[in-house]
């Protein structure tokens, strides 16, 4: 069964993000017969060209994305490879009554400090962690070298620095 783009019976999926990380998802969704509606900052990423429809809306603009998804009448929303995108996925899906992780589960999986606190509360093994600011001094903590500094709001290895000395 082949359905034409724009067909009312074609399932419409919103994909948050258009980079090389999301492109395999875009391509697989199209292969499975979904009409792809991709949202991202317009910067020449591959998904801008491979999506059926591309909307140059930054993924931090969750209310604008929600409004457009309602207008389109999407059937689902997803992403891959981006913690920031997952926040928007949960927000849009929850707001539209679609299947998704809860907003709280998404918060715990995207805020690394909140995640570590949840691990500690539940007795799950996890590296020691501390929230630090410019006033932090190593002598006031029980942390020892090497120390890994990681932004609380970045996925994978983005923003990681290893410190071996002061």
Feature-to-residue mapping (PLM):
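ATP-binding N-terminal substructure of ATP-dependent carboxylate-amine bond-forming enzymes
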Residues: 1-105, 121, 139
